[in-house]
Amino acid sequence: MKNDNRIIKNTIKQFKEKLCKDFSQKANITSITRKLAVFIDTILIQLFIKNKLHFGDNFCLLALGSYGRRELQLHSDIDLLILHTEKVSNIQLQRAQKFIQDCWDVGLEVSHQITTVSSCANLASQDLSVISTIMDMFLLCGHGALMEELIYQTHTLHMWPSHQYFFAKLQEQQNRYAKYGETAYNLEPNIKNGPGGLRDLQILLSISKRHFKIKKLAEGIGYGFITDKEYEELKYCQNFLWRVRFALHMLAGKPEERLSFDYQVKLAQFFGYQDQSHILAIEQFMKDYFKVIKRNRELNEMLLQWFNETIVYHQKQKIIRLDDEFQLSNRFIEVRNNRVFKQNPQSILKLFYWLVKRPDIEGVRASTIRLIRESLFLMGKRFRESKETANIFINIFRTGNDPYDALQRMNRYGVLAHYLDCFATATGQMQYDLFHAYTVDQHTLFVIRNISRFKKNEYAKQFPLCAKIITALEKPEILYLGALFHDIAKGRGGDHSELGAIEAQQFTQRHYMEAEDSKLIVWLVRYHLLMSQTAQRKDIYDPKTIEQFCQLLPHARYLDYLYLLTVADICGTNPTLWNAWKDSLLKELYHAAKTRLHKQQELLDEAALISIRKQYAMDILISDGISSRVIQDLWSQFKGKYFLHESPEVIARHTKAILNSKQFPVVIIMPHHSQGGTEVFIYMPHKDERFTITTSVLSNHHVTIQEAAIITCDNQFDLDTYIILDENNQAFLNEQRARDIQKNLCDHLANTGRLPAVSRRRLSRALTHFNVKTQINFIDDNTNHQTQLFLVTNDRPGLLATISRVFLTLNIHLHNAKIATAGERVEDMFYISNQTGYSLNHEEKTILKEKLILEISKSKY
């Protein structure tokens, strides 16, 4: 008996191998899934007969779910229902259990239920998933009358009337979207359960079956539920997703449903995508994938809405006229007749203008969505060059209301891509990294959504400065249009900011915008990264940095637009990207630039600035009862750079801590003055190893360094400041943890023995799939006798500790560091000098570069 099962198991293995070979040779996926279902039928029937369950009228074997629909994927579960009469004996039930055991023994992943018709019907009346799978049942073997009785007992006359079933399935989909629509699932989408995935197709078939009593979705054409073209589109989406899913199962060797990063690479290779100069094979594959799920989701939304309007609420219409072309039906906008778009194609855009102008409109009627999709061909060259069209499109952004929902719909219905060729190119474009969580088109719309949120009271507490600025903004439409074009050229190769600026220039000319408005929009697109790069890579406390930044702003008002776009852009790139530290950096840069641009502060020389900050700090300390002479004696040992970098409040706090200290090192952990991070302040006799010790200890405590300022005083004491964040990129809240770090730093900095070992930590699963080539560039800063080292590499635990050890080995002195992490990519800036205090020469740079690359490659664990 066991030998028979072994033979069957081997037969199944060989058959699946043959199917995989056929699939690899581009066999039709529908044929393959059906062949597999039919083959499994023969195995199950054979085992059913072997266990003598086919005699008489006591048992019935049914295939359910995708297996019942004859759509079996390579490693999908095989859903079975064994119905039996009330009078079966225990021996017969044991045979049924033995049948299931045989299924498992031959390697079939079987999910099963052994029950009576009445029990099954009772369960179906209470469980949505049960009634849904029953609707797909297919008779394999046994007494068919049992199946017919189950069909009768689960009919809409007895349970789950179509409207109740519809709303339950709709809620189920909303719950699924909430679960699988998160960022992680966007980077590594679930092909079965994710938004736009196969479940979105199955719900359309389910509600059609329940209401129209049809067996296939194609039969819904005759009921007006779906058009021929829409059916063909859905069929295309289904076949694409089936092919990807079959290949995923084949490559994984198991029922894998998630397109994780490693499988994305393998799938792109399997389907024949090849890297191009400006776009990776994986990005091409995922672009096609995202386009398909976007189309699938769009059709799902439209057809479910059609069902709701036509079947559920068909007798409850309240009509309100808007104009000659549009009206509201139960708060949903619709055309007043089906010739509107043909007679006046500009009305396609006008509909979306109404959506922005009237925020009380809840959506677009399904019949009108269908008409929009059928009318997209009218949006040709003549349409796009029309001045009337241009005015309507610009007015969408000029109403003063939130345009996000209207633009989101324009994107879903294909209107934006038909109106803007450059947007069509960007649609579905994904970047293969952990930094960008969304496709370019979705990210763009999220940035626009974020701008609109700055105006809303519920976001004023989270973004107070943005809320203040945007209320005084003269022309918000400029900001919206800058956002629309800021990433429009991603995926083409070259500098997307420059290419996007060209697109923006052409757009503003075609839309008859005023010269000054056009100039600002183009500038925003070209320089949309300026503020974030300045804040994260440069010393924003240095007046020269502020002066250089301001010189790139043609007018003071440009700063307001740029700040708002920068915040909206960061928040719309990845939900984990924005934190209090980035917030504080951008605010400080904004305020410093604002002061300089409005001439409230003339460009002072360093000596004057130092004098002002010293005086403010002195006033604070004297008010605390500290002698001015004691303060001046201490300050006389500090470098001028320290007073430029720190605010008067921080200078006073550091000074007080040093003067109150009874021993060295002085280590203080406290909130940074901006409250965006946690500050680690260290004052101690000079020690070359201190940077290495500090980075090693902090790495072992799983904190990340955002900034470091390293200063050796004239009295040969070191005065170092670090800004750190916890694992969640937030300032520390745990006082005990801060005390533990403080104690460890004190112990190791005071110790003259070995350097602290850096604890080894594994890379996260996601990080292991990315390989950022280590790049090192040097720029000499002759004014300060320093060399700027710009490092790009893979993020990994303990990276900064590794770098610090290289600096120590080669006698490289660090003066300042700016640390920036974007997903798997680290972009760090170090201001360094050699052991004599000067910029590195060519030989020193070469040795440092080679040593860093070697040690970084060894530290990837």
Curated annotation (Swiss-Prot):
SMART domains: HDc. Gene3D superfamilies: Beta Polymerase, domain 2, Hypothetical protein af1432. Residues 322-678 are annotated as: Uridylyl-removing. Residues 440-562 form the HD domain. GO terms for biological process: regulation of nitrogen utilization. It catalyses: [protein-PII]-L-tyrosine + UTP = [protein-PII]-uridylyl-L-tyrosine + diphosphate; [protein-PII]-uridylyl-L-tyrosine + H2O = [protein-PII]-L-tyrosine + UMP + H(+). Uridylyltransferase (UTase) activity is inhibited by glutamine, while glutamine activates uridylyl-removing (UR) activity. The keyword Transferase applies. InterPro entries: ACT-like_dom_sf (IPR045865), ACT_dom (IPR002912), GlnD_Uridyltrans_N (IPR005105), HD/PDEase_dom (IPR003607), HD_domain (IPR006674), NT_sf (IPR043519), PII_UdlTrfase/GS_AdlTrfase (IPR013546), UTase/UR (IPR010043). Residues 1-321 are annotated as: Uridylyltransferase. Its EC number is 2.7.7.59, 3.1.4.-. Residues 679-760, 788-861 form the ACT domain. Keywords: Hydrolase, Magnesium, Multifunctional enzyme, Nucleotidyltransferase, Repeat, Transferase. One of its GO terms (molecular function) is [protein-PII] uridylyltransferase activity. Has four distinct domains: an N-terminal nucleotidyltransferase (NT) domain responsible for UTase activity, a central HD domain that encodes UR activity, and two C-terminal ACT domains that seem to have a role in glutamine sensing. NCBIfam families: UTase_glnD. This is Bifunctional uridylyltransferase/uridylyl-removing enzyme. It comes from Legionella pneumophila (strain Corby).
